[in-house]
């Protein structure tokens, strides 16, 4: 199995609800370790650039407005098959369609305020990680097992 890195974002609704630790804990419990993490407020330009692939979609303006409405947590998660594993942990984009026990089913309000973002492919993960984190800000480390 391949060790991968993926971008995860705890969106403004997740930060506002005070569930940052719970979300990170879910990733760690499933073998994804944060190797870079930052709390920040996205500018309009950053959000528009990051979501540029959706620029022609009718929801683009609302997405940018939401993603700039409050702080977000940007993370690089590392682990075996990190992209697919992250998407499983998050659940379906629409919380109503998400499986029980996923982040979106448990914490999200609706398809817009769906609490988390995760890269959708290995290729996009590389692009998304580099958008927010220069390589020097990503730190590999080994987990030590507790006795």
From Swiss-Prot:
Protein name according to UniProt: Nucleoside diphosphate kinase
Described function: Major role in the synthesis of nucleoside triphosphates other than ATP. The ATP gamma phosphate is transferred to the NDP beta phosphate via a ping-pong mechanism, using a phosphorylated active-site intermediate.
Alphabetized UniProt keyword annotations: ATP-binding, Cytoplasm, Kinase, Magnesium, Metal-binding, Nucleotide metabolism, Nucleotide-binding, Phosphoprotein, Transferase
Catalysed reactions listed for this entry: a 2'-deoxyribonucleoside 5'-diphosphate + ATP = a 2'-deoxyribonucleoside 5'-triphosphate + ADP; a ribonucleoside 5'-diphosphate + ATP = a ribonucleoside 5'-triphosphate + ADP
Keyword field contains Phosphoprotein: yes
Quaternary structure annotation from Swiss-Prot or TrEMBL: Homotetramer.
PROSITE patterns: NDPK, NDPK_LIKE
Binding-site residues, ATP: 11, 59, 87, 93, 104, 114
Signal peptide, first to last residue: none
Recorded GO MF terms: ATP binding; metal ion binding; nucleoside diphosphate kinase activity
């Amino acid at each position: 199995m391949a060790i991968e890195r993926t971008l995860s974002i705890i969106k403004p609704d997740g930060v506002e609800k005070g569930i940052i630790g719970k979300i990170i804990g879910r990733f760690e419990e499933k073998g994804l370790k944060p190797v870079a993490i930052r709390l920040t407020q996205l500018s309009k330009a950053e959000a528009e650039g990051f979501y540029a692939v959706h620029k022609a979609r009718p929801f683009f303006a609302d997405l940018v407005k939401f993603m700039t409405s409050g702080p977000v947590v940007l993370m690089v998660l590392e682990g075996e098959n990190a992209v697919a594993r992250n998407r499983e942990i998050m659940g379906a984009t629409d919380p109503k369609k998400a499986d029980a026990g996923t982040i979106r089913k448990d914490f999200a309000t609706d398809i817009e305020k769906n609490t988390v973002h995760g890269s959708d492919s290995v290729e996009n993960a590389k692009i998304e990680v580099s958008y927010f984190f220069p390589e020097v800000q990503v730190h590999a480390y080994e987990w030590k097992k507790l006795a």
